[in-house]
């Protein structure tokens, strides 16, 4: 299966399935001499892992990461870093009844069309469980970006269903189970989730991720534009059906005089572009949003077919998230970090000696 690797100089390759023995990844391109321990990776894994809230799947995986290679005496060696997380709470029997049935809205049908077979246990390779390794790899990138360049990457939920959320307090994000930055909406989110669990249904969400302190000049013309690579990375996350950079689709209703980010001697006067012009970072905050569909793993009956072409009624059993967008926040942060680290290394490799007299803010 191709398509398991992202990045050029900072490269992340993941492997593993939802109900396999383990998940793993190989991280190439990490510079030597960076202090790194398993504890550095565990914080973000704990933010993503299942079973930590009554609002997410009750599959209880500790997601304890092991560093297998690339670190000696507490620092990176510059060689490939191997990471592994063992699966410990698989309940494959939950899926035995659907081994011949295509769950509507899932990858069951398309995987079988492509490969002629599929791992029906929890979706196999198509499961969001795979993203645990992205978060582990992304934690390496976040540490490097923060310590070497002062870059901070933060994400939060900015909409669930028809409930929009304002970014009022970043410190609140880690203090509630929704990654919600809006203290006035937490009760409404709680009420919605309770209703969904009672109905056996699910809901979509919007996640916003912001990178601060990114230097100007990252990104490559034409096909490796920074925003193109960010969109690619975020779109690769399970259930994501749309990505916006900056004002995104809202620019359709704006005029050029409103949308252009004017510059004065004091700096940029707005950031409609999300910190990227011509595919290259401007030094402003990089802002991206992603829309996640409601999961199709619900107990509301739905129509589908089996592999013999017969129509059947489908009710999903097992342990699932009523809103997959909640746990997507640390995944979005990880993917943005991976892209930024890759482009920083590429910029240093080609343009390390470039200096300009143009102001930077």
UniProtKB/Swiss-Prot annotation:
It comes from the Bacteria. Its EC number is 4.2.3.5. The keyword Nucleus does not apply. The keyword rRNA processing does not apply. GO terms for molecular function: chorismate synthase activity; FMN binding. FMN binds at residues 125-127, 238-239, 278, 293-297, 319. Reduced FMN (FMNH(2)). NADP(+) binds at residues 48, 54. PROSITE patterns: CHORISMATE_SYNTHASE_1, CHORISMATE_SYNTHASE_2, CHORISMATE_SYNTHASE_3. Disulfide bonds: none annotated. One of its GO terms (biological process) is chorismate biosynthetic process. Its cofactor is FMNH2. GO terms for cellular component: cytosol. InterPro entries: Chorismate_synth, Chorismate_synth_AroC_sf, Chorismate_synthase_CS. Keywords: Amino-acid biosynthesis, Aromatic amino acid biosynthesis, FAD, Flavoprotein, FMN, Lyase, NADP. It catalyses: 5-O-(1-carboxyvinyl)-3-phosphoshikimate = chorismate + phosphate. Pathway: Metabolic intermediate biosynthesis; chorismate biosynthesis; chorismate from D-erythrose 4-phosphate and phosphoenolpyruvate: step 7/7. Homotetramer. Belongs to the chorismate synthase family. This reaction introduces a second double bond into the aromatic ring system. This is Chorismate synthase. It comes from Shigella flexneri. The lineage of its organism: Bacteria, Pseudomonadati, Pseudomonadota, Gammaproteobacteria, Enterobacterales.
């Amino acid at each position: 299966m191709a398509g398991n690797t992202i990045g050029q100089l900072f490269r992340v390759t993941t492997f593993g399935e939802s109900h396999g023995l383990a998940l793993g990844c190989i991280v190439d391109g990490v510079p030597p001499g960076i202090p790194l321990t398993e504890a550095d990776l565990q914080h973000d894994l704990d933010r993503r892992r299942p079973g930590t809230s009554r609002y997410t799947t009750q599959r209880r995986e500790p997601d304890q990461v092991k560093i297998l290679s690339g670190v000696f005496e507490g620092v990176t060696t510059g060689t490939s870093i191997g990471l592994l997380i063992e699966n410990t709470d698989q309940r494959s029997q939950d899926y035995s009844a659907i081994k011949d049935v295509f769950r509507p809205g899932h990858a069951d049908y398309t995987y079988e069309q492509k490969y002629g077979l599929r791992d029906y246990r929890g979706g196999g390779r198509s499961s969001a469980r795979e993203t645990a390794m992205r978060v582990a790899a992304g934690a390496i990138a976040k540490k490097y970006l923060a310590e070497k360049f002062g870059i901070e990457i933060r994400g939060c939920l900015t909409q669930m269903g028809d409930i929009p959320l304002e970014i009022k307090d970043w410190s609140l994000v880690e203090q509630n189970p929704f990654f919600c930055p809006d203290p006035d909406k937490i009760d409404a989110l709680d009420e919605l989730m309770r209703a969904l669990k009672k109905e056996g249904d699910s809901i979509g969400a919007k996640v916003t991720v912001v990178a601060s302190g990114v230097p100007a000049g990252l990104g490559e013309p034409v096909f490796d534009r920074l925003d193109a690579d960010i969109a690619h990375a975020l779109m690769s996350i399970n259930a994501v059906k749309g990505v916006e950079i900056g004002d995104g689709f809202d620019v359709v209703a704006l005029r050029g005089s409103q949308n252009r980010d004017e510059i004065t001697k004091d700096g940029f006067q707005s950031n409609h572009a999300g910190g990227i012009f011509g595919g290259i970072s401007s030094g402003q905050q990089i802002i991206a949003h992603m829309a996640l569909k409601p999961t199709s793993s619900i107990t509301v009956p739905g129509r589908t077919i089996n592999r013999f072409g017969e129509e059947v009624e489908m009710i999903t059993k097992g342990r699932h998230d009523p809103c997959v967008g909640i746990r997507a926040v640390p995944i979005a942060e990880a993917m943005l970090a991976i892209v930024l680290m890759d482009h920083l290394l590429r910029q240093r490799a080609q343009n390390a000696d470039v200096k300009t007299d143009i102001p930077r803010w």
